[in-house]
A protein has these predicted regions:
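P-loop NTPase motor core
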Residues: 95-161, 413, 425-434, 440
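A structural signal for short, well-ordered beta-strand segments and their strand-loop junctions
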Residues: 105, 116-118, 250-258, 359, ...
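Coil-to-beta-strand transition motifs
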Residues: 9, 23, 99-101, 112-115, ...
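Electropositive, glycine-dotted interaction segments
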Residues: 120-276
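Short Pro/Gly-enriched beta-strand edge/turn motifs at strand-loop
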Residues: 86-90, 298-303, 394-397
């Protein structure tokens, strides 16, 4: 077999403890199992096999969205620091848990290296307790990059580094960080340290990990206003139009139009507008000669690209659509809810999204069931040639009925009698090879993944209603 050699950034595992409905540690894994079905879309090298898709099913209030929120929390912690409303996000079914740290661990292929990053935080007070980063070698040996213990005021640069000056430099910054219990060291070491990375190339592993969280991980939920990679550009408009047309929207062409700044200022909160502009100005400081920093702001039925031109002037653009006639163009508000949702999701199908991880809650919101299935079929076919990873939550059982998913691409979230969310990969149930997953959900084999109705209470309500 010829092993793949391209540079990769892919998610391996994500673990969470004492966060929202997760009490004891729950591990979400993208590691491939023994299934032979659709093996072309499994990434493999000498040491690991990874799936590129994971669909998470579960009853209402089982905790599916809480897993997505856990991803979002970790990303926010790394990029922006503690998000608002964090103090009550521990597992509150057990009051004593407010005094127990919440823990998060993420395992990645980062430039083909197996990297593990983890931290623990006491959410009730917002105090970070521990943080560490290390590499796991092919022989399963740990090579520490750094270890930070804020309870004991300890910081140690690890044996990952070979250069003595690099170790001294990292320890210097690390020792300064042990008094700050609200910020992760990974965040601190990635603000205003460009010269340090130039002078100490070994430290770039810290920069690469930060970039993964900032640019290669996209977390989306139905209510979020997202700022991210501006994927609507003149270079890929045809690709987007062709995809939208193939998915049955009737759209045949797109064009980019400029929007007056005053109109946008009146549409979005001043705080958000200022944050987007501030982020662009920070990017502008280190941009190359030909690079114009840009960011996309998107919410329901509105897409805007903010960019600074060569003179650092702010330019805001949006997109318009034509159907059969290219002489008439419409804005997004004039399109259907389904088309707006497709535009929110189309990024996962673009070539520029290779090597990225998308975590999306309620992918089927506003989409016709057939559209959801067709879009997933298209993504899974493209996954044979790309290394984009897609993690979604869904209630759409037709995805199971269509039999387009491998068993190791399916995960269930159930809630036990204690109110704890439990992650159960489908492979845990050890279905027979000839057993169809859709049938197993309704014949009792997978009964614990379905909503738990109280038939006795329902009959009582009906009886009372008739009396």
């Amino acid at each position: 077999m010829k092993w793949q050699r391209e540079v990769l950034n892919m998610l391996i595992k994500f673990s969470v403890t004492n966060f929202l409905s997760f009490n004891n540690e729950q591990c979400f894994s993208m590691e491939a199992g023994k299934a032979r079905k659709n093996s072309k879309r499994v990434y493999r090298d000498k040491n690991i096999k990874l799936t590129k898709c994971e669909v998470i099913f579960g009853a209402n209030a089982s905790g599916k969205s809480n897993l997505i929120e856990a991803f979002q929390f970790v990303q926010n912690m790394v990029i922006d620091g503690l998000p608002r409303g964090f103090t009550n996000k521990y597992f509150r079914q057990i009051p004593a848990n407010q005094s127990i740290p919440s823990s998060f661990k993420i395992e990645l292929l980062l430039d083909n290296n197996h990297i593990i990053y983890e931290f623990s935080i006491l959410l009730k007070t917002g105090s970070i307790e521990e943080e560490q980063l290390y590499e796991l070698t092919a022989s399963s040996q740990k090579k520490s990059i750094f270890y930070r213990n804020l309870k004991s005021s300890i910081f140690e640069a690890g044996d990952y580094f070979k250069n003595k000056n690099t170790v001294e430099k990292l320890n210097m910054y690390g020792e300064d960080s042990v008094e700050d219990r609200e910020l992760l060291f990974l965040s601190m070491i990635n603000h205003g340290k460009e010269k340090m990375y130039e002078d100490n190339p070994e430290l770039k592993i810290l920069r690469k990990l930060y970039i993964w969280f900032n640019s290669l991980l996209t977390v989306s939920n139905p209510d979020s206003i997202l700022t991210g990679y501006p994927y609507f550009s003149s270079s890929n408009l045809n690709e987007i139009a062709n995809l939208l047309n193939a998915l049955g929207t009737g759209i045949s062409d797109l064009k980019i139009v400029e929007v007056p700044i005053d109109i946008i200022k009146n549409k979005i909160p001043e705080e958000l507008f200022n944050k987007v502009v501030s982020d662009l100005e920070k990017k502008s400081v280190n941009r190359g000669k030909r690079h114009c920093p840009s960011v996309m702001l998107r919410s329901y039925k509105e897409f805007y690209t903010f960019e600074l031109n060569e003179n650092d002037d702010l330019i805001i653009k949006t997109i318009e659509f034509s159907h059969e006639s290219k002489s008439v163009y419409f804005n997004l508000k004039e399109e259907s809810d389904g088309t707006a949702r497709l535009l929110d999701l189309i990024e996962i199908l673009l070539k520029v999204s290779d090597n990225r991880v998308f975590v999306i809650d309620e992918i089927d919101r506003c989409l016709h069931p057939v559209m959801t299935t067709r879009m997933m079929e298209l993504f899974l076919k493209m996954a044979e040639q790309r290394n984009t990873q897609l993690i979604i939550t869904s209630h759409e059982s037709r995805l199971l009925a269509a039999e387009i998913l491998r068993n190791d691409e399916i995960c269930f979230v159930i809630k036990n009698g204690k109110g704890e969310s439990i992650l159960n990969p489908l492979e845990k149930y050890q279905l027979r090879a000839d057993k169809k997953v859709y049938s197993a959900m309704f014949d009792g084999t997978l009964s614990d993944v379905l909503p738990n109705y109280n038939e006795e209470k329902m009959n009582f309500i009906l009886k009372k209603d008739r009396s």
